[in-house]
């Protein structure tokens, strides 16, 4: 009702696949065309993939949806060593849950502190201390060289410098990439 009072049509659950700014028209995935005066593009995003050799192997997990969590859960019985790449909120939450289940968990963070892009040093230090206290092995300033593959699945993570970490399960939590392809195709400029 509040949206209607502001003369705004909210259309949740519709996927826009193309935009024609000159015609003030957007085309939905099902072919429906929607005309607009002004449009707000709330694009959402997809998990960033690991840009390292082996980063696209089956069995490299991300956490974005319930289905992602279910896929991780399905592999937990046979996973003793879990490597989480990314020391943001997603990676730390996963580490907390998994170490609580008795798993050996290593968190690899490229920055020199956890949560570096979203929190100040004091909060980063607090999360690091609490996770270490619970048994999470945290490696800061970690650079991933490759995912070690065995039988088409991840078997470990190789760090720059040559150290290998065993991994029965790898979770990547390194942010999201906005889904802006239809806007770029319509002529919008992508900020870099």
Indicate where each model-derived feature is located.
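Glycine-rich Rossmann-fold phosphate-binding loop(s) that bind the pyrophosphate
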Residues: 64-65, 85-90
């Amino acid at each position: 009702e509040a949206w209607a009072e502001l003369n705004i049509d909210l259309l949740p659950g519709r996927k826009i696949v193309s935009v024609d700014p000159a015609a003030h028209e957007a085309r939905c995935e099902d072919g429906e065309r929607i005309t607009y005066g002004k449009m707000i593009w709330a694009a959402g995003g997809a998990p960033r993939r690991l840009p390292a050799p082996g980063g696209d192997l089956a069995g490299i997990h991300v956490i974005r949806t319930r289905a992602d969590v279910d896929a991780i859960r399905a592999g937990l019985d046979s996973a003793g060593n879990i490597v989480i790449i990314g020391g943001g909120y997603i990676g730390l939450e996963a580490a907390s849950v998994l170490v609580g289940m008795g798993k050996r968990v290593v968190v690899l963070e490229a920055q020199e502190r956890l949560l570096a892009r979203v929190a100040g040093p004091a909060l980063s230090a607090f999360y690091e201390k609490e996770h270490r206290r619970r048994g999470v092995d945290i490696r800061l300033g970690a650079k991933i060289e490759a995912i070690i593959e065995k039988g088409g699945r991840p078997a470990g993570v190789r760090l720059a410098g040559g150290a290998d970490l065993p991994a029965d399960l790898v979770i990547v939590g390194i942010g999201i990439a906005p889904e802006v392809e239809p806007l770029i195709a319509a002529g919008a400029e992508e900020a870099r």
